[in-house]
């Protein structure tokens, strides 16, 4: 997909009052202002009016350090250097990732960030239970963005939008002021993302964000960049890029360097590139990517795609598409409710 100035061209989606089965959405949240750092890139989050860092701190990896103090230091250093977008999930490391981020956001750091987490619950009951746990772990009364996690099965959209589906809990939580924006994530197949957008539209609902794989191999197989991103941009939905390195597997292919992979992601019309950061050196790499970023030319993009095509087609490096390696809810169906 060619790079475009999506801040100017993304059209805000409107919900028609006459849509069959339309869900009565709460008023739009008021954007908040956060400190910015001249060495960081900032972008608009879809059509929300929120301005967030183009580099997002991945939540999974900050729950892996042996010493929780190391996790907190990574988070504080990231924020001090201008990263405002915090990623997390209710199930990451059995809740440890949220707990550590909650401690890190004490003492004024919460006001400096745009906080996102994800919930697995597909029913009202399970969603509400997980939301209350996440609020407690994160030491906050309101989470800026909550996303339906791992929408990876074709039936997931219908479960979420069912009469007892989690969408109703999310909307009630937004109305109550517990969450500000609603999105969804998935990594398996673009067809599932498109189905989610189709079901949402049928119910008169507009997502604020959608999270998807965006990396140097995606273009060659089940491409979210080609199939989903244009639809999201057209609907004014903020695109959150993930799986930039495919965990470590894409880098293991030896076809691309880390900075090159991050610059490729930042060149796409995304609001945020969420990247896993498990140490201060890896954080430094992400900060360097922001400082040195210049949009890749068409020739540079072509060179990257030519280099990665053969490896991508083996299916060995985007394991989140081809194996259950990353499917936490498949291994733990009780999380869905």
What are these regions, as identified by a protein language model?
Residues 58-68, 118-125, 158-159, 252:
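Active-site mouth loops of central-metabolism enzymes
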Residues 92, 107-128, 149-152:
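Structural motif corresponding to the early beta-alpha repeats
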Residues 84-91, 116-118, 180-185, 211-212, ...:
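Short catalytic-loop micro-motif centered on adjacent basic/acidic residues
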Residues 1-112, 169, 175:
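N-terminal binding-site loop/beta-alpha segment at the start of enzyme catalytic domains
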Residues 41, 71-75, 97-104, 130-134, ...:
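A general structural detector for well-ordered alpha-helical segments in enzyme core domains, enriched
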Residues 45, 57, 86, 101, ...:
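Conserved, mostly hydrophobic/aromatic
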Residues 13, 203, 227-337:
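Structured C-terminal cap/extension of enzyme domains
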Residues 122-227, 233-240:
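Glycine/proline-rich, positively charged
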